[in-house]
Amino acid sequence: MKWFFSNFKIITFLIKQVNNLNNCYIWLLFFAYSVLVSLFIQLIALPLIFPNLHIGNGLLDGGDWIVYQKYGVIMANVIIDNGWENWYLRPEGFGIVGVVSAIYAFFGIFEPYILVPFFSVLHALGALCILIITQSLGVSRSTAFFSCLPYLIFPSSLLWLSQILKDVFTLNASLIMLLGMVLFFGAIDKKSIKSQIISQSIAIFLILTSLFLIFISRPYMIELSSIFILIFEFILGIKLLTRIFQSNISLINFAFCIFAQILILFLAFNINSIEKHFAAYSINQNEYHVYISKSDKEIKKIFLERNLPMQIIEEKAGKIINKKELALEILKDIYKKPKSALRLIPSFNAESIKNYIPDLPTIEFETYESRKWQNSAFLPRVVDVQMSKVNDQRNYFYLHQYHANTTFDYDVEINSAIKFIRYLPRAVQVGYFAPFPTDWNSSKSNKANLMHKVIALEMIFIYLAFSGFIIALFIWRKKFEFWLLIAFSLFYSLFPVYAFPNIGALVRYRYAAIMIIVALSLSAISYLYSSKIKSNHSYE
């Protein structure tokens, strides 16, 4: 071991180089890596090395990215043929389709490789956020640099970096939000009013930018992020109170902090009004937009057999069906299982759906009824309502994904505050340690088996890295910023366990949250080792 640590000239050289790089150069380094590895996946790895996993256009066979690619091309053609007034940020409620179609239409290239630079910008920014956040705890720049690398280079991140997935927006947006919060914390300790105002203004800008990115991809997570902002405000309030008792903050600084907090809360909770504005361009509650293209032979056949109105325009446009009954009948034929149609009509409740589809299995409604939320008598109404929404999302997920290979805890109900709390230990276990070793070789398909092996290697690294968390807890237990990072990790790791009980979804949703713990753990181990080296030199 001594020989290993005494022969690290290359590592020492790299550390010196990192310490001399500013954030812009580090971001460029992260960006270059992201672009190169994504293009390698799309242009070389999939078509040449793993052709059995390749469906074309540099995309994996199977996944939401196929749908986003298809409709991105359709909407891009609509824009090119009819003008940019036909572009919407969230066509049919899918923000990622709006982004993809805009890029495709602007460049006139309908291949996913043109998206790589845009996705890489966000991924590199997310990694840089972790670097700055960990450095704010007082670790060296080189330590922070190496601690953020797992987020940048873990193979699972290639899924949303090289394919078309919403996670590239939400994961990096959440880290941008966290960076804004950390900067806000640091602004409190600034002596200059001007410096404080500048820092807090940047923090507010970052938080609002993150909310907008979340709005583009997953609008339902805006409210979730607003709840975490409340947690941030609570921790910040405690820090302000300690500064007041210590007489370590001026009245002007305190007043501006309160004003900034109120502004963030107001904007965060009113950004939903933007969502409502863009929803006007989405599917009307009484209309269903069904795209009919030449390749959709099955759908075209159904339309012809039922003598329904339709319009075929080369993969470019579609026809609006104005009656819910007709839409449901079509969906029944397109999907072999009637319950699949429910995925496209979330505004309906179970009983109204049953009226339109009489042959829908009754047992599913009985199960849904038994899982309905039971109001709590001891919690504030606002908290109870938010918990009920998570329970509804969980039920909705089970309704359509119960057959998925990695869905878990189907028989566990969390339909009351008591059950919600009792489930917490299990949620922590799954949120931070799943998939478990027993699940690493549970898949039979080649594609899933490859992904399981990749995730298994990542989990081994994560398990080892977690050993440093106890050290981190001891070193930074008195820092408010540290507890903000812990709150962030807990919040965004546990929420998907409650709302999306599927390992595949969990691995993606929790990625930023679990990488914060990994970064803290690695930073703590490095910090401890550096302290030991310094003490040995002092002793000599």
Residue spans of the language-model regions?
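Hydrophobic, aromatic-rich transmembrane alpha-helices
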Residues: 2-10, 427, 431-436, 452-479
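Short hydrophobic/aromatic helix or loop-helix immediately within or flanking a transmembrane segment
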Residues: 64-110
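Membrane-interface helix-loop-helix junctions at transmembrane boundaries of multi-pass membrane enzymes
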Residues: 136, 190-202, 243-244, 445, ...
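Membrane-interface alpha helices of multi-pass inner-membrane proteins
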Residues: 158-159, 194-225, 230, 261
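Short acidic/glycine- and proline-prone juxtamembrane loop motifs at membrane-interface regions
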Residues: 162-169
